[in-house]
Amino acid sequence: MTASLRRPATLLTIGQLCREFDVTPRTLRYYEEQGLLAPERREQQRLYSRRDRARLQLILRGRRVGLSLAQIRQVLDLHNPADQDAA
Protein backbone atom coordinates (compact mmCIF):
# COMPACT_ATOMS: atom_id res chain seq x y z
CA MET A 1 0.00 0.00 0.00
CA THR A 2 1.40 3.41 -0.90
CA ALA A 3 1.79 6.22 1.60
CA SER A 4 -0.90 8.28 -0.14
CA LEU A 5 -3.43 5.48 0.35
CA ARG A 6 -2.63 5.20 4.07
CA ARG A 7 -2.76 8.96 4.67
CA PRO A 8 -6.04 10.17 6.20
CA ALA A 9 -8.22 11.94 3.65
CA THR A 10 -8.18 15.11 5.73
CA LEU A 11 -4.47 15.71 5.07
CA LEU A 12 -3.34 17.19 1.76
CA THR A 13 0.14 17.42 0.32
CA ILE A 14 1.51 20.75 -0.84
CA GLY A 15 0.85 19.73 -4.45
CA GLN A 16 -2.77 18.83 -3.76
CA LEU A 17 -3.43 22.10 -1.94
CA CYS A 18 -1.71 24.08 -4.71
CA ARG A 19 -3.91 22.47 -7.35
CA GLU A 20 -7.07 23.01 -5.31
CA PHE A 21 -6.41 26.74 -4.82
CA ASP A 22 -4.36 27.45 -7.96
CA VAL A 23 -1.35 28.76 -6.02
CA THR A 24 2.33 27.86 -6.23
CA PRO A 25 4.25 25.81 -3.66
CA ARG A 26 6.40 28.91 -3.07
CA THR A 27 3.28 30.84 -2.07
CA LEU A 28 2.35 28.23 0.52
CA ARG A 29 5.91 28.13 1.86
CA TYR A 30 5.92 31.94 2.10
CA TYR A 31 2.66 31.93 4.07
CA GLU A 32 4.23 29.33 6.35
CA GLU A 33 7.35 31.51 6.80
CA GLN A 34 5.08 34.42 7.71
CA GLY A 35 3.31 32.33 10.35
CA LEU A 36 -0.02 32.28 8.53
CA LEU A 37 -0.01 28.53 7.92
CA ALA A 38 1.44 25.76 10.08
CA PRO A 39 1.30 22.46 8.20
CA GLU A 40 2.18 19.20 9.87
CA ARG A 41 5.64 17.94 8.90
CA ARG A 42 6.43 14.29 8.27
CA GLU A 43 10.03 13.84 7.25
CA GLN A 44 10.46 16.30 4.36
CA GLN A 45 6.76 16.51 3.48
CA ARG A 46 4.29 19.20 4.46
CA LEU A 47 0.79 17.92 5.17
CA TYR A 48 -2.08 20.37 5.32
CA SER A 49 -5.16 19.77 7.49
CA ARG A 50 -8.72 20.97 6.97
CA ARG A 51 -7.83 23.83 9.33
CA ASP A 52 -4.89 24.84 7.11
CA ARG A 53 -7.17 24.64 4.07
CA ALA A 54 -9.70 26.96 5.75
CA ARG A 55 -6.93 29.39 6.75
CA LEU A 56 -5.60 29.44 3.18
CA GLN A 57 -9.08 30.17 1.92
CA LEU A 58 -9.29 33.17 4.29
CA ILE A 59 -5.79 34.35 3.29
CA LEU A 60 -6.63 34.25 -0.41
CA ARG A 61 -9.95 36.02 0.12
CA GLY A 62 -8.17 38.72 2.09
CA ARG A 63 -5.59 39.18 -0.67
CA ARG A 64 -8.37 39.45 -3.28
CA VAL A 65 -9.99 42.32 -1.40
CA GLY A 66 -6.67 44.09 -0.95
CA LEU A 67 -5.69 43.28 2.63
CA SER A 68 -2.02 43.16 3.56
CA LEU A 69 -0.59 40.02 5.15
CA ALA A 70 -0.42 41.87 8.49
CA GLN A 71 -4.14 42.65 8.24
CA ILE A 72 -4.89 39.07 7.25
CA ARG A 73 -2.91 37.85 10.28
CA GLN A 74 -5.13 40.01 12.51
CA VAL A 75 -8.24 38.52 10.91
CA LEU A 76 -6.89 35.00 11.38
CA ASP A 77 -6.06 35.76 15.02
CA LEU A 78 -9.63 36.97 15.56
CA HIS A 79 -10.94 33.87 13.81
CA ASN A 80 -8.87 31.56 16.04
CA PRO A 81 -7.71 33.30 19.23
CA ALA A 82 -6.30 30.03 20.63
CA ASP A 83 -3.37 30.45 18.23
CA GLN A 84 -2.35 33.63 20.05
CA ASP A 85 -1.98 31.71 23.31
CA ALA A 86 0.35 29.20 21.67
CA ALA A 87 2.63 31.93 20.27
Q: What function would you assign to each model-found segment?
A:
Residues 1-19, 38-42, 50-87:
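Arg/Lys-rich, alpha-helical DNA-contact motif
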Residues 45:
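Conserved catalytic core of two-component sensor histidine kinases, primarily the HATPase_c ATP-binding
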Residues 31, 48:
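Conserved active-site tyrosine of GNAT-family acetyltransferases
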